[in-house]
């Protein structure tokens, strides 16, 4: 296992994703600041946060548990991004780039989960 969560590619890519999500949601309507914008940002932040928390437990079982929470947050984030596009808060090219990042993090996360011994 990595010495520190910052060494994990999954965490690094998730942090990049959060930065991208914050930039995307900056253009959302102000009336959504405490609603969809907040939900999207929380879901995004949850991904690297759970990776870090899980790695800090030093147990493969607990690490896997927190990684699965991260995967759940990715599904939540994907749904919310699609909703934002449907509502006209972001155009397809903008959400498509963010969704590609979400899928990339998901693939890396699934690989990390699969690599952990039972």
Give the ranges of each region predicted by the language model.
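Short, C-terminally biased terminal segments at protein or domain edges
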Residues: 1-118
